[in-house]
Amino acid sequence: MKKRKELNALIGLAGDSRRKKPKKGPSSHRLLRTEPPDSDSESSSEEEEEFGVVGNRSRFAKGDYLRCCKICYPLCGFVILAACVVACVGLVWMQVALKEDLDALKEKFRTMESNQKSSFQEIPKLNEELLSKQKQLEKIESGEMGLNKVWINITEMNKQISLLTSAVNHLKANVKSAADLISLPTTVEGLQKSVASIGNTLNSVHLAVEALQKTVDEHKKTMELLQSDMNQHFLKETPGSNQIIPSPSATSELDNKTHSENLKQDILYLHNSLEEVNSALVGYQRQNDLKLEGMNETVSNLTQRVNLIESDVVAMSKVEKKANLSFSMMGDRSATLKRQSLDQVTNRTDTVKIQSIKKEDSSNSQVSKLREKLQLISALTNKPESNRPPETADEEQVESFTSKPSALPKFSQFLGDPVEKAAQLRPISLPGVSSTEDLQDLFRKTGQDVDGKLTYQEIWTSLGSAMPEPESLRAFDSDGDGRYSFLELRVALGI
């Protein structure tokens, strides 16, 4: 309400000031107004009465306002002037800074223009250098000595090195297996001894058979003569059967009976001896067959090993040719590495070649010798009886046998050791060994290969107390060293 009153007072002061001016010319104002003058005077008087108190107050407020304005106007002007001065100073400072910046920019532009001019001159040079470097890179990548060919050569080298390593490993394995070739001389010596013993036994057996055949033929002749004599004697006795027999005839009959019994015993002994000789011949034939089979197996193994060594040498020569062709394509950088690797590989291959060539020569010579000996053995075994030389001592013994037919034990003594050995060389039996596989297992149990030899004690410890006597095995020991090989045990077992 107070504010409203103050506003009304201010409005009233303004109205009074406006109304006082027309009082100087009331006539004119009245002409303009439509209201009567009486009403105006009344209204003015009323307004003066109403706003008398308010006018006094407004006058007091107006004085205060004027005082404030006298103080504020200079302050505001000073503040505005100071602001203008500060703004001018700032503008001047900014202008100076801008000028410095413009000078610096101008210098930079000048340097840039100079650099640009020089760069325009250097750009073609740089382009030429870039083109030359690009050409060099292309040459390095796809030139004669480029990275592509180097990579291809490196891959070929890796392949050839892998082939060489595989070939070297194969040769190492062959060298390890060549230990059998080293042991060939001993095996060949054993075969020579066994072949010699077989030849001796065959000769003795053939001689004994010839002597037996001659004695049997002569014994048949004597038997026929005796039978004819007996028939004649019986024919002579039949017509004089009714007569009284004197005492000398009785004694002759007794002599004939004893003679016939002796002849029967001699015939039985001859049959037994012939059976023993036949069994001995069968045993010798088995031994010869087994030993010939062993010889054939060893010869075939030797030929296979020689062929393998030859194929390895051929493969190594091919690999060396390929390696030489590929190594010639490499550059100077890889030349040193190649030379070192080739030197190592060639040294190894040369040593292996020399060893293989020596072993081949020795094996070929040994194989040729073995083949010659096998041919001789086959010629001896297949020789007919008609080409064999006669023996005078056998004829003398046959004559003594015909003169004394009851002396057959002397003939057995004449046959001597070959017949006894033939009787003793019958196959024996070992407990748990009935085939070649069982025999191989026996060698494996004792910790030896098939090429090794076993003693009687080793066989006894592996098989037990059911072993036969050592004398029965000694007959099959062709070397006489007290050790039994795989072939000797096969012959002894008859498998």
Curated annotation (Swiss-Prot):
Top-level taxon of origin: Eukaryota
Location of the EF-hand domain: 434-463, 464-495
Positions annotated to bind Ca(2+): 477, 479, 481, 483, 488
PROSITE patterns: EF_HAND_2
GO molecular function: calcium ion binding
InterPro entries associated with the record: EF-hand-dom_pair (IPR011992), EF_hand_dom (IPR002048), EFCAB14 (IPR042352)
UniProt xrefs under Gene3D superfamilies: 1.10.287.1490, EF-hand
PANTHER family found in the cross-reference section: EF-HAND CALCIUM-BINDING DOMAIN-CONTAINING PROTEIN 14, PROTEIN KIAA0494
Protein name from the UniProt record: EF-hand calcium-binding domain-containing protein 14
